[in-house]
């Protein structure tokens, strides 16, 4: 009944991943991002992560697997997803939705910390403002984007972009793979400490 649809969806997902893998710059960007994060942790820094919708879930997933565990038991790493509902509703109400992440970065971000901003379009105003706040604090910035990078293109120390122009879910599927690989590489880097 739906076998063709299922095959088409899985084939499109595989094709999106294959296209991402073709560009060697993506492999290097993932490695640079992992080393940047591990270096921050080794120096006493932390990572703040943010995004909207499914990207917000990815930001929380990233922080959870750093503070908790991924595949192996190891010490937790300092990671905070900007996901506190009371903060988001307060700032959204009092300052506007575009400020929900930047206010948090202004409050707890420090020089030497890292911001991971996730946006499939690269045009999320609240993530862009968080990047600006992170820069003002002397933080490093990593972005996970899609399509042409949108307004976030060129704003990060490391941008990992999925150049897919279809639905956002295909971009998110690559983002979660990248997040898992980042955690794996961070764990390897932290053992070197």
UniProtKB/Swiss-Prot annotation:
<keyword id="KW-0479">Metal-binding</keyword>
<dbReference type="GO" id="GO:0005737">
    <property type="term" value="C:cytoplasm"/>
</dbReference>
<feature type="binding site">
    <location>
        <begin position="52"/>
        <end position="54"/>
    </location>
    <ligand>
        <name>substrate</name>
    </ligand>
</feature>
<feature type="domain" description="SIS">
    <location>
        <begin position="37"/>
        <end position="193"/>
    </location>
</feature>
<protein>
    <recommendedName>
        <fullName>Phosphoheptose isomerase</fullName>
        <ecNumber>5.3.1.28</ecNumber>
    </recommendedName>
</protein>
<dbReference type="InterPro" id="IPR050099">
    <property type="entry name" value="SIS_GmhA/DiaA_subfam"/>
</dbReference>
<dbReference type="Pfam" id="PF13580">
    <property type="entry name" value="SIS_2"/>
</dbReference>
<dbReference type="InterPro" id="IPR035461">
    <property type="entry name" value="GmhA/DiaA"/>
</dbReference>
<feature type="binding site">
    <location>
        <position position="172"/>
    </location>
    <ligand>
        <name>Zn(2+)</name>
    </ligand>
</feature>
<keyword id="KW-0862">Zinc</keyword>
<feature type="binding site">
    <location>
        <position position="172"/>
    </location>
    <ligand>
        <name>substrate</name>
    </ligand>
</feature>
<comment type="subunit">
    <text>Homotetramer.</text>
</comment>
<feature type="binding site">
    <location>
        <position position="65"/>
    </location>
    <ligand>
        <name>substrate</name>
    </ligand>
</feature>
<dbReference type="GO" id="GO:0097367">
    <property type="term" value="F:carbohydrate derivative binding"/>
</dbReference>
<keyword id="KW-0963">Cytoplasm</keyword>
<dbReference type="GO" id="GO:0008968">
    <property type="term" value="F:D-sedoheptulose 7-phosphate isomerase activity"/>
</dbReference>
<keyword id="KW-0413">Isomerase</keyword>
<comment type="similarity">
    <text>Belongs to the SIS family. GmhA subfamily.</text>
</comment>
<feature type="binding site">
    <location>
        <begin position="119"/>
        <end position="121"/>
    </location>
    <ligand>
        <name>substrate</name>
    </ligand>
</feature>
<feature type="binding site">
    <location>
        <position position="65"/>
    </location>
    <ligand>
        <name>Zn(2+)</name>
    </ligand>
</feature>
<feature type="binding site">
    <location>
        <position position="61"/>
    </location>
    <ligand>
        <name>Zn(2+)</name>
    </ligand>
</feature>
<feature type="binding site">
    <location>
        <position position="124"/>
    </location>
    <ligand>
        <name>substrate</name>
    </ligand>
</feature>
<comment type="function">
    <text>Catalyzes the isomerization of sedoheptulose 7-phosphate in D-glycero-D-manno-heptose 7-phosphate.</text>
</comment>
<dbReference type="InterPro" id="IPR046348">
    <property type="entry name" value="SIS_dom_sf"/>
</dbReference>
<dbReference type="InterPro" id="IPR001347">
    <property type="entry name" value="SIS_dom"/>
</dbReference>
<feature type="binding site">
    <location>
        <position position="180"/>
    </location>
    <ligand>
        <name>Zn(2+)</name>
    </ligand>
</feature>
<dbReference type="GO" id="GO:0005975">
    <property type="term" value="P:carbohydrate metabolic process"/>
</dbReference>
<dbReference type="GO" id="GO:2001061">
    <property type="term" value="P:D-glycero-D-manno-heptose 7-phosphate biosynthetic process"/>
</dbReference>
<dbReference type="GO" id="GO:0008270">
    <property type="term" value="F:zinc ion binding"/>
</dbReference>
<keyword id="KW-0119">Carbohydrate metabolism</keyword>
<dbReference type="InterPro" id="IPR004515">
    <property type="entry name" value="Phosphoheptose_Isoase"/>
</dbReference>
<feature type="binding site">
    <location>
        <begin position="93"/>
        <end position="94"/>
    </location>
    <ligand>
        <name>substrate</name>
    </ligand>
</feature>
<comment type="pathway">
    <text>Carbohydrate biosynthesis; D-glycero-D-manno-heptose 7-phosphate biosynthesis; D-glycero-alpha-D-manno-heptose 7-phosphate and D-glycero-beta-D-manno-heptose 7-phosphate from sedoheptulose 7-phosphate: step 1/1.</text>
</comment>
């Amino acid at each position: 009944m739906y076998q063709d649809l299922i095959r088409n969806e899985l084939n499109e997902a595989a094709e999106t991943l294959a296209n991402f893998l073709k560009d060697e710059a993506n492999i290097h960007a993932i490695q640079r991002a992992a080393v940047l994060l591990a270096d921050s942790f080794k120096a006493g820094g932390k990572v703040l992560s943010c995004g909207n919708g499914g990207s917000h879930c990815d930001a929380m997933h990233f922080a959870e697997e750093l503070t908790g565990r991924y595949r192996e038991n190891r010490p937790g790493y300092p990671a905070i997803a900007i996901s506190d509902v009371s903060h988001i509703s307060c700032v959204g109400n009092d300052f506007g939705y575009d400020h929900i992440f930047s206010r948090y970065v202004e409050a707890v971000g420090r020089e030497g910390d890292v911001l991971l901003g996730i946006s499939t379009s690269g045009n999320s105003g609240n993530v862009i403002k968080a990047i600006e706040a992170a820069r003002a604090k002397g933080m490093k910035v990593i972005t996970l984007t899609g399509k042409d990078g949108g307004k976030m293109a060129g704003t990060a120390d490391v941008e990992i972009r999925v150049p897919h122009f279809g639905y956002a879910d295909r971009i998110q599927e690559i983002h979660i793979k990248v997040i898992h690989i980042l955690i794996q590489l961070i764990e390897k880097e932290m053992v070197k400490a």
